[in-house]
């Protein structure tokens, strides 16, 4: 019932956003539009540049890690396990996000230049490598990479993994909120043109008013994180079994991502000929995985699974 209500609210919100221009747009002139053109750089020292995206990305990961650390302490799990979890998670998130972008969105380019998948370099016209930083991280790839990393963490630590995955899933929403704010500071992953009253103009893209989808997603993630921690505080594992929060987060995030893609500009050219874009196609299996995990964990997992192997 909780899931159905939440999904209905997602649909109503996205429907309001998508149709807002028909209802409200004509009431506002371009003077009401928000022209969004921040400097993505915080400061430069020599060749070093500190970007807002990097700072917000790091803030999201640190705060998410802090939340998981609190749960480890609450359940009396040894500190060494948390330290190992951080290492595995970082590798899974980074490699998954990077490879996800390279293989899902630009496979032809990166398969011909595999070194650029892993190293922050590019090749110039003369065939020489130069430092260019990493350009392109895919959130779906990050989710897949993180889940694989958690499986390796389970193999190494022998911990009951479902509670850990629950905590990581809750924390992921917090990290995602800050990452989308970083995208906003970079004026990237923009929405489709619109005339809704809250439209943003991104001068680095064009002069068209667009849906600020980065804000939509960031606000959704903040709300989802808040709802999840309230549910966890009220129910913990007394009324639900381990795996519940993981399943719920997968369904909510994938469901919202599928919906918001309708007002998001396509990321790569080949998506123009697709019925659904790449983000939507990748969201479908994650949503179905959440459904399967919800049924399996709540019917088959023991209630005391979260208390095993915690030394």
Regions found by a protein language model. Give the residues of each.
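Hydrophobic, membrane-interfacing alpha helices
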Residues: 3, 8-311
